[in-house]
Structure formats: structure tokens, C-alpha cells
Amino acid sequence: MTAVENVALPALYAGVKKNERVKRAIEALESVGLGERIHHKPSEMSGGQRQRVAIARAIINNPRILLADEPTGNLDSKSGEEVLEIFKKLNDNGTTIVMVTHEEDVAEHCKRIIRLKDGVIEKDEIVYNRRGV
């Protein structure tokens, strides 16, 4: 399955017609910097590119909230920064990003940090001077 086919799947499940699905999938891939990779398969992409395909798939139906569980966990630092920049742009355009991470440097990109310990909220802070997802 190519990147554009993969990204279009949620729109298929939502009942979107094929032409509109493909158009949205291409737009989503372009928005995450993969416009030139739409016909590539996962085996032809780096880990960071595959993660951006997953983000494009998650945003194709324009969700108000995006849940991200360890979105940078398996990425090198450059690819991780690219993913966080995509999240920042999505957030700037009105999408709420709920991100789970164990990495302090990733959490530093967030506007609000809720720390859990043993399943209990230990600290809830809004941080205004962050780079902001």
C-alpha cells in the first residue's frame, strides 16, 4: 500500500468519495512534508517519514483532538523535532494535541504538562514560555 492509499483509509471508513479521499490524502501528506513521497511504500521510507504518514492519516478527517502516544519514541532527534514542529502547526491551526511521553525534552514543547505517578496526577502546570504544542 502506498502512502496516499494508507492515509486515505480513514476517509474511506468515513464514507468520503474516492476523488475527495485522494485529494485530502495528498493534502495531508503535503502538510507533513511528504508531497514528493505519496506513491512510496513504507519499505521505501525512513522511520521519520513513516511517522509523518501516520500523522497525515490521523489528520485526514480534520479531528479537533489528536492523541499521540510516544510520537517521537523511535525516532532520531532530527525526525523527532520535525514531528513536534508538525504538532505545533496543527495546534496553531486549532487542533488540540494530547501527547504522552516519558521524554522531558519532548514535554518541553508543550503548553501544558500533566505529570502522572502510579496513575495519579502528581502535577498539572500550564507553561507560557514553551515552544508550544
Provide a role label for each language-model segment.
Residues 1-116:
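ABC family nucleotide-binding domain
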